[in-house]
C-alpha cells in the first residue's frame, strides 16, 4: 500500500458475499485491478475519486478478518464499509466484533450493507436501531422499497448511495477544484439521501433556539417573506434554525475553496440531511424543496432556473 494514501476498509461478515464483490460493485467493474500483497490476504483496489468539487486517490482495502488489520492500514482508514448476512438472526453479531476497531479509527463514513433486510433474520427496525446506536448508515443493495418516481428529490439507494457517501467524504489527500458555483446541485444530491441514516445525531439531537430574533428576521425564508440577492421572494420556512443553516450554507459555498471550508460545508449538509430524514415522507419532500429554493436565492441564483423544481409552488 502506497504511503499516505487513505483507504476505505471493506469487509464482509457473510460466507456468500465477499468484500471483493462489493468493491467491484462500487468500482462498476468485474475486472478491477488488484494490487498484489505478500500474504494475499489483504487486497487493495486503487480508486480515483474525481467529481466536480475535488479529486482524491484512495484505496478500497478488502480485509477478510480483524487480525489482518495492520498498523499501517489502521492509520490509513478514513471510511468503513461492512457487509452482513441479514437472513441470519445472528447476522449483526459478527459486525459488532469490528466495533472496537472502528472506535479507534473514528472514520467519517461508516456504512452497514446487506442485500436487503429480512423479516426472518434481521428486519429493518433491528438494522436501523443498530445503526443509530453505533453511528452507521444502512444501505440495502436491492431494497424492496424504491423511491417514488414522482419524488422531486429521490433518495439514493444501493451501490449508488455507497459511492455517493464515499464521494462526500473529505479525504486527507483531497485536491480541491476551483469551481465553487455548483452548490445547488450538491444540495440536491445530498439533501435527500438515504432514509436509513444511521447517525445517533439524526434521531436524538435537538436544535437550540435561534440566538437572536433580529438575525432571524434578516435571513432568507423567514415567515414574513425574505429576498435573496436576486431580490426574489422565497417560500416561508418556519424553523428559524433552518434559516441560519441556509445562511451558513450560502456563506460556505461562495467562500474560499480551502479544505476547512469544504469540510464544514459537507458537515452542514449532513446535519440538514439527518434532520430532514426524521420527517414523514411528504414533509421531507416539502422541506427539501424549501431548502433548495432558499439556498439558491441566498447564493444569488436566478429564480427562473428553479421554477420547475416543484410541481406545487403553493406550499
Curated annotation (Swiss-Prot):
User: As annotated in Swiss-Prot or TrEMBL, what is the tissue specificity of this protein?
Assistant: Widely expressed.
Which InterPro entries does the protein's record reference?
Alpha/Gamma-adaptin-bd_p34 (IPR019341)
Identify the stretch(es) annotated as Disordered.
Answer: 201-229
Q: List the GO terms this entry assigns under cellular component, sorted alphabetically.
A: cytosol; nuclear speck
Spell out the Polar residues composition-biased ranges.
201-210
Q: Where in the cell is it found?
A: Cytoplasm, Cytosol
Primary location: cytoplasm
Keyword flag Cytoplasm? yes
Listed A to Z, the keywords are: Cytoplasm, Phosphoprotein, Protein transport, Transport
Domain of life from the UniProt record: Eukaryota
A biological process from GO: protein transport
* Positions where Phosphoserine occurs in the chain: 310-311
Q: Which Pfam family is one of this chain's hits?
A: Adaptin_binding
The function of this protein is: May be involved in endocytic recycling of growth factor receptors such as EGFR.
* Record note on quaternary structure: Associated with AP-1 and AP-2 complexes.
Q: Report what the protein is called.
A: Alpha- and gamma-adaptin-binding protein p34
UniProt source species: Rattus norvegicus (Rat)
The beginning of the lineage is: Eukaryota, Metazoa, Chordata, Craniata, Vertebrata
